[in-house]
Amino acid sequence: MRQADVTRNTSETKIQISINLDGTGKAELASGVPFLDHMLDQIARHGMIDLKVVANGDAHIDDHHTVEDVGITLGQAFAKAVGDKVGITRYGHSYVPLDETLSRIVIDFSGRPGLEFNVPFTRARVGDFDVDLSIEFFRGFVNHAGVTLHIDNLRGINAHHQIETVFKAFGRALRMALAVDPRASGSIPSTKGSL
Protein backbone atom coordinates (compact mmCIF):
# COMPACT_ATOMS: atom_id res chain seq x y z
CA MET A 1 0.00 0.00 0.00
CA ARG A 2 1.51 3.29 -1.12
CA GLN A 3 0.31 5.43 1.74
CA ALA A 4 1.90 7.75 4.27
CA ASP A 5 1.04 9.86 7.29
CA VAL A 6 3.46 12.65 8.20
CA THR A 7 3.33 15.24 10.96
CA ARG A 8 5.59 18.30 11.09
CA ASN A 9 5.59 20.55 14.14
CA THR A 10 7.70 23.71 14.38
CA SER A 11 7.40 26.94 16.34
CA GLU A 12 5.69 28.42 13.25
CA THR A 13 3.36 25.65 12.03
CA LYS A 14 1.75 22.34 12.85
CA ILE A 15 1.07 20.23 9.75
CA GLN A 16 -0.54 16.78 9.40
CA ILE A 17 -0.73 15.13 5.98
CA SER A 18 -2.07 11.74 4.91
CA ILE A 19 -1.78 10.50 1.33
CA ASN A 20 -2.76 7.44 -0.65
CA LEU A 21 -1.03 7.36 -4.03
CA ASP A 22 -3.50 4.76 -5.31
CA GLY A 23 -6.58 6.74 -4.38
CA THR A 24 -9.52 8.19 -6.25
CA GLY A 25 -8.77 11.90 -5.93
CA LYS A 26 -10.58 12.54 -2.64
CA ALA A 27 -9.38 15.50 -0.60
CA GLU A 28 -10.02 16.80 2.91
CA LEU A 29 -8.25 20.13 3.15
CA ALA A 30 -7.92 22.55 6.05
CA SER A 31 -4.64 24.41 5.58
CA GLY A 32 -6.00 27.72 6.82
CA VAL A 33 -5.13 29.23 3.42
CA PRO A 34 -8.23 28.93 1.20
CA PHE A 35 -6.43 29.43 -2.11
CA LEU A 36 -3.83 26.80 -1.15
CA ASP A 37 -6.67 24.38 -0.36
CA HIS A 38 -8.08 25.05 -3.84
CA MET A 39 -4.68 24.23 -5.38
CA LEU A 40 -4.15 21.11 -3.23
CA ASP A 41 -7.55 19.91 -4.42
CA GLN A 42 -6.23 20.15 -8.00
CA ILE A 43 -3.27 17.91 -7.10
CA ALA A 44 -5.57 15.32 -5.51
CA ARG A 45 -8.19 15.29 -8.27
CA HIS A 46 -5.83 15.32 -11.23
CA GLY A 47 -3.27 13.04 -9.59
CA MET A 48 -5.91 10.54 -8.39
CA ILE A 49 -4.29 10.85 -4.97
CA ASP A 50 -6.30 10.77 -1.76
CA LEU A 51 -5.05 13.69 0.31
CA LYS A 52 -5.81 14.96 3.80
CA VAL A 53 -4.16 18.16 5.03
CA VAL A 54 -4.63 19.84 8.40
CA ALA A 55 -2.44 22.86 9.08
CA ASN A 56 -2.22 25.50 11.76
CA GLY A 57 0.26 28.27 11.09
CA ASP A 58 1.24 31.75 12.16
CA ALA A 59 -1.27 33.36 9.79
CA HIS A 60 -1.25 36.50 11.96
CA ILE A 61 2.14 37.17 10.34
CA ASP A 62 1.34 35.93 6.82
CA ASP A 63 0.79 32.68 4.93
CA HIS A 64 4.43 32.10 3.98
CA HIS A 65 5.33 29.56 6.68
CA THR A 66 2.11 27.60 6.26
CA VAL A 67 2.40 27.31 2.47
CA GLU A 68 6.09 26.42 2.59
CA ASP A 69 5.66 23.89 5.40
CA VAL A 70 2.71 22.22 3.68
CA GLY A 71 5.00 21.80 0.64
CA ILE A 72 7.76 20.35 2.85
CA THR A 73 5.42 17.95 4.63
CA LEU A 74 3.75 16.87 1.40
CA GLY A 75 7.19 16.17 -0.06
CA GLN A 76 8.06 14.05 2.98
CA ALA A 77 4.78 12.16 2.63
CA PHE A 78 5.43 11.43 -1.05
CA ALA A 79 8.97 10.22 -0.31
CA LYS A 80 7.63 7.89 2.38
CA ALA A 81 4.73 6.59 0.27
CA VAL A 82 6.88 5.98 -2.84
CA GLY A 83 9.50 4.15 -0.79
CA ASP A 84 12.23 2.43 -2.83
CA LYS A 85 10.53 3.36 -6.15
CA VAL A 86 10.42 -0.24 -7.36
CA GLY A 87 8.15 -0.57 -10.39
CA ILE A 88 7.21 3.10 -10.80
CA THR A 89 7.33 4.82 -14.18
CA ARG A 90 9.62 7.49 -12.62
CA TYR A 91 9.07 10.27 -15.19
CA GLY A 92 5.89 12.24 -15.71
CA HIS A 93 4.80 15.23 -17.73
CA SER A 94 1.65 17.14 -18.50
CA TYR A 95 0.42 20.15 -20.42
CA VAL A 96 -2.74 21.78 -19.06
CA PRO A 97 -4.67 24.64 -20.67
CA LEU A 98 -7.24 26.89 -19.03
CA ASP A 99 -8.71 29.41 -21.42
CA GLU A 100 -5.79 31.63 -22.54
CA THR A 101 -3.26 29.93 -20.26
CA LEU A 102 -1.02 26.91 -20.92
CA SER A 103 1.39 25.34 -18.43
CA ARG A 104 3.78 22.39 -18.59
CA ILE A 105 5.17 20.23 -15.80
CA VAL A 106 7.93 17.63 -16.12
CA ILE A 107 8.92 15.57 -13.07
CA ASP A 108 11.56 12.93 -12.33
CA PHE A 109 11.51 10.86 -9.13
CA SER A 110 15.30 10.76 -9.36
CA GLY A 111 16.26 11.20 -5.73
CA ARG A 112 17.95 14.46 -6.75
CA PRO A 113 16.12 17.62 -5.66
CA GLY A 114 15.99 20.29 -8.33
CA LEU A 115 13.48 22.98 -9.24
CA GLU A 116 13.22 25.10 -12.37
CA PHE A 117 10.31 27.51 -11.92
CA ASN A 118 9.44 29.70 -14.90
CA VAL A 119 6.11 31.39 -14.27
CA PRO A 120 6.00 35.07 -15.30
CA PHE A 121 3.08 36.04 -13.07
CA THR A 122 0.93 38.83 -14.44
CA ARG A 123 0.10 40.21 -10.99
CA ALA A 124 1.37 39.88 -7.42
CA ARG A 125 -1.75 38.49 -5.76
CA VAL A 126 -4.70 36.26 -6.49
CA GLY A 127 -7.24 37.49 -3.96
CA ASP A 128 -5.34 37.38 -0.67
CA PHE A 129 -2.78 34.85 -1.94
CA ASP A 130 0.75 36.10 -2.68
CA VAL A 131 1.69 34.37 -5.96
CA ASP A 132 5.35 34.12 -4.86
CA LEU A 133 4.26 31.55 -2.26
CA SER A 134 3.67 29.03 -5.04
CA ILE A 135 7.43 28.78 -5.62
CA GLU A 136 7.97 28.32 -1.87
CA PHE A 137 5.46 25.45 -1.90
CA PHE A 138 7.18 23.70 -4.79
CA ARG A 139 10.68 24.32 -3.41
CA GLY A 140 9.64 22.70 -0.13
CA PHE A 141 8.08 19.77 -1.97
CA VAL A 142 11.07 19.18 -4.27
CA ASN A 143 13.66 19.32 -1.49
CA HIS A 144 11.82 16.79 0.66
CA ALA A 145 10.37 14.47 -2.00
CA GLY A 146 13.75 14.24 -3.73
CA VAL A 147 12.45 15.01 -7.20
CA THR A 148 13.56 17.11 -10.14
CA LEU A 149 10.70 19.37 -11.22
CA HIS A 150 10.43 21.71 -14.21
CA ILE A 151 7.52 24.14 -14.10
CA ASP A 152 6.84 26.33 -17.13
CA ASN A 153 3.90 28.62 -17.74
CA LEU A 154 4.08 28.88 -21.53
CA ARG A 155 1.46 31.61 -21.84
CA GLY A 156 -1.17 33.28 -19.74
CA ILE A 157 -2.78 36.57 -18.81
CA ASN A 158 -4.85 35.68 -15.74
CA ALA A 159 -2.62 34.93 -12.71
CA HIS A 160 -5.27 32.64 -11.18
CA HIS A 161 -5.24 30.60 -14.40
CA GLN A 162 -1.44 30.54 -14.37
CA ILE A 163 -1.26 29.04 -10.88
CA GLU A 164 -4.20 26.69 -11.39
CA THR A 165 -2.81 25.19 -14.60
CA VAL A 166 0.53 24.64 -12.86
CA PHE A 167 -1.11 22.73 -10.00
CA LYS A 168 -3.37 20.73 -12.33
CA ALA A 169 -0.44 19.78 -14.55
CA PHE A 170 1.58 18.90 -11.43
CA GLY A 171 -1.14 16.48 -10.33
CA ARG A 172 -1.32 14.86 -13.75
CA ALA A 173 2.49 14.56 -14.01
CA LEU A 174 2.59 12.94 -10.56
CA ARG A 175 -0.04 10.46 -11.67
CA MET A 176 2.06 9.48 -14.69
CA ALA A 177 5.37 9.28 -12.83
CA LEU A 178 3.97 7.22 -9.96
CA ALA A 179 2.04 4.77 -12.12
CA VAL A 180 3.22 1.22 -11.56
CA ASP A 181 4.54 -0.29 -14.79
CA PRO A 182 3.71 -4.01 -14.75
CA ARG A 183 6.62 -4.68 -17.11
CA ALA A 184 9.02 -3.21 -14.55
CA SER A 185 7.77 -5.31 -11.66
CA GLY A 186 10.49 -5.71 -9.08
CA SER A 187 12.92 -3.34 -10.77
CA ILE A 188 14.05 0.21 -10.12
CA PRO A 189 13.76 2.56 -13.12
CA SER A 190 17.46 3.40 -13.34
CA THR A 191 20.51 1.84 -14.98
CA LYS A 192 22.30 2.43 -11.65
CA GLY A 193 19.92 0.05 -9.92
CA SER A 194 18.95 2.59 -7.28
CA LEU A 195 17.40 6.03 -7.00
Curated annotation (Swiss-Prot):
Protein name: Imidazoleglycerol-phosphate dehydratase
Transmembrane spans: none
NCBIfam families registered for this protein in UniProt: PRK00951.1-1, PRK00951.1-5, PRK00951.2-1, PRK00951.2-4
Catalytic reactions on record: D-erythro-1-(imidazol-4-yl)glycerol 3-phosphate = 3-(imidazol-4-yl)-2-oxopropyl phosphate + H2O
Alphabetized InterPro entries for the sequence: IGPD_sf, ImidazoleglycerolP_deHydtase, ImidazoleglycerP_deHydtase_CS, Ribosomal_Su5_D2-typ_SF
Known pathway: Amino-acid biosynthesis; L-histidine biosynthesis; L-histidine from 5-phospho-alpha-D-ribose 1-diphosphate: step 6/9
Gene Ontology molecular function, alphabetical: imidazoleglycerol-phosphate dehydratase activity
HAMAP family membership: HisB
Family assignment from sequence similarity: Belongs to the imidazoleglycerol-phosphate dehydratase family.
Locations listed in the record: Cytoplasm
A family per Pfam: IGPD
CDD domains: IGPD (cd07914)
